[in-house]
A protein has these predicted regions:
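Repetitive, compositionally biased segments used for assembly/scaffolding
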Residues: 85-195
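Long terminal segments
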Residues: 1-84, 164-209
Length: 209
């Protein structure tokens, strides 16, 4: 049996519901009951930190939109060295380094900022692309690239979810004040329809809650 808790409050301020859900996760862990905490939208870095700080564990998190990919794990696993090699960077490109990030300058004027994960020691959570001081793109990593977010004036306008080979499996596209969703060749116009597709992919049994 697996117990699924759906988080519908990612975009809201911290509240008592968050604490109660984390307490329940701890209780289920102590009872050795398999449980998943489902993110129904991709959380921003500070939100992910918040939920992890409450006691949730990476291996218990389930990202609904990543289910449309063939990714095996969303847990940060790549080191600075591994990504430095991937981006063909050298020590000469390194401009600054601390416990929280490493900044590289590319020949085309782009600055890459490797943000370290606070809960997976030595691993990079995401890479930010800055041009002329502006954030243009953010790539999230597990064992491979998971998600790419595109920014315009600091606002996310597109989010792509990748298969292990880098191909796009699912996308969120901002259209004015609303969002459209691309799943393969289909365009879905409501989040409700997206969640229906997600639930259809879950390996649910009659014992699950």
């Amino acid at each position: 049996m697996t117990i699924y808790t759906f988080n519908l409050l990612v975009g809201y301020e911290p509240n008592g519901v968050d604490v109660a859900q984390a307490s329940r996760a701890l209780m289920l862990r102590e009872l050795n009951e398999p449980a998943k905490f489902v993110f129904t939208t991709w959380p921003q870095p500070y939100k992910l930190d918040y939920y992890l700080s409450l006691g949730h564990r990476y291996e218990e998190l389930l990202h609904a939109y990543l289910s449309f990919t063939d990714q095996d794990s969303h847990i940060p696993s790549l080191t600075v060295g591994a990504l430095q090699q991937k981006f063909k960077l050298t020590r000469l490109d390194l401009k600054s380094q601390s416990e929280t990030d490493s900044v590289y300058a590319c020949s085309d004027g782009t600055f890459l900022v490797f943000k370290m994960d606070s809960y997976q020691k030595g691993c990079v959570r995401y890479v930010d692309y800055h041009v002329n001081g502006m954030l243009l793109k953010r790539e999230w990593y597990g064992t491979s690239k998971l998600v790419t977010e595109y920014f315009e004036k600091g606002i996310i306008i597109r989010r792509s979810y990748h298969n292990k080979d880098g191909r796009i499996a699912f996308e969120e596209l901002k259209q004015g004040t609303s969002w459209l969703y691309r799943l393969g060749t289909e365009i879905l116009v409501t989040k409700t329809e997206v969640m229906r597709r997600f639930l259809a992919r879950l390996p649910l049994t009659t014992a699950d809650t």
